[in-house]
């Protein structure tokens, strides 16, 4: 675990990523896609689905980062239709599959909050920290957050790329998150599971970034923590040192 004291200095607000940081699909993406294919009479191994999804999601992400990063609801809809089509090209009715998957991942029942999310949200509030949940997602995230008990009171704290008009790592995305908390970027810490979107991108926009590496697979040179419990402990330790 690598942290820097400078990461915490003068922090007044936190920008939290959503998927992979606060929530994850449950059942897994691979299982849901495989079951969708099965309903059309096509059997695909979950491991193969997982490999395809990671490949095409990453390809799409890289293509987006090379472009202007502009987005809206229609763009996100087209993006996910493209990804689903690439992951499940064998299906006789791809539009039906896409519609099923789009609806599925827009329901709270398709997601779970990590066990450390509820305590972390309460700790942020108790500490008087401003915070927002900021994600490359679309309007479906509002229903998802509203339906998860640990996050239900956070719907008014959402910053969603399709509503901002730009995806991470565009500077406007982080600026919008900071403005929503009424804070300067240098008073804001961004926390998430993607080195580019949650660390390097925020730093270019004047914020600070901290990687949440739940699977311990990320670059060691980036300041990171393994979970939200560690995030809260580190923040409390820093405050205790500052007031000692």
Model-derived features with residue positions:
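Asp-based, Mg2+/Mn2+-dependent phosphohydrolase catalytic module
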Residues: 1-14, 24, 47, 92-98, ...
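N-terminal helical cap/lid subdomain that shapes the substrate entry/recognition surface
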Residues: 4-118, 122
């Amino acid at each position: 675990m690598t942290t820097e004291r400078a990461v915490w200095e003068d922090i007044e607000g936190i920008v939290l990523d959503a998927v992979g940081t606060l929530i994850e699909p449950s059942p897994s993406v691979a299982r849901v896609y495989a079951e969708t294919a099965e309903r059309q009479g096509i059997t695909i191994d979950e491991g193969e689905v997982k490999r395809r999804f990671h490949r095409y999601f990453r390809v799409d992400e890289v293509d987006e980062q090379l472009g202007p990063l502009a987005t809206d609801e229609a763009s996100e809809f087209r993006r996910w239709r493209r990804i689903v089509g690439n992951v499940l090209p064998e299906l006789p009715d791809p539009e039906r599959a896409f519609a099923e998957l789009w609806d599925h991942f827009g329901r709270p029942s398709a997601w779970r909050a990590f066990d450390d999310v509820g305590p972390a949200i309460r700790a942020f509030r108790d500490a008087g920290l401003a915070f927002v949940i900021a994600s490359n997602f679309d309007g479906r995230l509002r229903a998802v957050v509203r339906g998860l008990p640990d996050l239900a009171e956070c719907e008014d704290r959402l910053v969603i790329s399709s509503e901002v008009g730009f995806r991470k790592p565009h500077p406007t995305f982080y600026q919008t998150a900071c403005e929503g908390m009424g804070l300067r970027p240098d008073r804001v810490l961004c926390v998430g599971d993607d080195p580019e979107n949650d660390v390097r991108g925020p730093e270019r926009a004047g914020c600070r970034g901290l990687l949440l590496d739940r699977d311990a697979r990320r670059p060691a040179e980036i300041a990171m923590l393994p979970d939200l419990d560690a995030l809260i402990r580190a923040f409390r330790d820093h405050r205790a040192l500052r007031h000692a």
